[in-house]
Amino acid sequence: MNNYIVRVNVGWVLVFHLTVCCLGTTWAADSAFPESQNVFPDTTVAWINIADPDAFSKSFDRTQYGKLIRDPHMEAFVKSFREQLSKAGKQRLGKLGLTIEDLGQVPGGEIAIAAIVPEAGRLATVLLVDTTGHEEETKQLLDEIETRLVEQKAERLADYEKKIRVYRLPQESPSADNKDAAEPQEQVVAVVHEGKALVVGDDPVQVSHVLAVLENGREDCLASTEQFKNVSKGALKNLGPENSKLRWYIDPFAFAAAYKSAHPANKRQKGPDYVEILGRQGFDAVKAMGGAIVFDAGPFQMRHQTIVYAPPLPGRDPLSVDRYDLAARMLRFPESEEIQPFDWVPSGVSSWSSLKWDIQTAFQSAESLVDDVVGEKGVFDDVIASLKEDPDGPQIDVEADLVACLGKKITLIGDFEEPIDVDSDRLVIAIEAIDPEKVAATVGKSMATD
């Protein structure tokens, strides 16, 4: 496993906490159903959960970040951010008849959301909430959901399996000026509250399937898949059960393919399809990604462990450059016990991130990717050759005079200028040089012809 040291931008930390704060309520000690990864099916391609949001929020409050947002000087910012978060929630949850504020009224335990691919070309979303201790509030919420959907001119259909409320949303008419717009897709909302669980989704069949296995879970669940097991093993390493976590998981190529089918683009959309290109270039070797976020974890204010699960192709040496095909061979990140900042990095910078990357292999693997993006074979070689041979160009051998002189350490440094303004941010990208004199000469030669 590759180890990276990352300083996280405070803005993202605030996003996590203020989102969870919207869920603040009283939490039950006992779960109403098995952990959601044992409830959602093995066709789940994306998943987010917080098993104990109350403990998660409290752990944040104990950090310096928590103290920062409680500072009176931050009051206006926090208020504005909450309003923006609420507005964003309305845009995303509105079609399900929900708001961010609703999610603060009913949870008594875990909150989880999953993207499921029931069959090729379809993508279903299901929200699962443990409502233990909040059954009455949940019943009221169901009535509020119906009122909101009716206001959106949704049509209530016959209950699915006599217990799941189903609403058909009105289709958005394409603009008369946009003849290339994709055909509008039928959208429905399915809602059910049974026992101590609230299940909301855009596919009544998938909502029914989740409801049916809430007592004992299912054998063919997300947690049973090889990808999820490997991601979880790495993401949870050295994180004890005492740490309340936000966890996430995604099968990036399966999710992208399903999303693309479920949300067709304009008929004449121009430009390359980068997801298809990456798949053709071998990057579909990345089977899954996931992680866990904890606050107040020992010496760390915030700890985020992210895992990319990309096993070598069958029969390939895991340590070989050729463990993947084509451009995906550039996915080589050497092991490192730790990565320390360069000596010249100031102590007062606002952020610092660093990793190790085999730049030489990446360069040698880039040809097919560049050609695929451009749509013409030989483009990459032509550009490299022209930089070396064109009498009006810099006449540099990119691989020998530059790439071969670079090390494997890459660093991103964030800082700001005062007084603080909208354009105060500064960013430096630094790459280790093992032959700095030759690198300087090559860069100087290239700039001289610019």
Regions found by a protein language model. Name each.
Residues D425, I429-T442:
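C-terminal substrate/ligand-recognition segments
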Residues A28-P184, E226-A288, F295, I307-D423, ...:
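Structural boundary/hinge residues at secondary-structure and domain interfaces
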Residues G11-T25:
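Bacterial N-terminal signal peptides
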Residues Q187-G201, V205-V210:
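Hydrophobic or amphipathic alpha-helical targeting/insertion segments
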Residues I145-E151, V207, L211-T225:
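A short alpha->loop->secondary-structure connector
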Residues T131-E135, D202-V207, A433-P436:
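Helix N-cap motif at beta-to-alpha junctions
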Residues M1-G11:
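N-terminal secretory signal peptides that target proteins for export/translocation
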Residues P41, G133, V192-L198, Q301, ...:
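Short, solvent-exposed coil/turn segments at beta-strand boundaries
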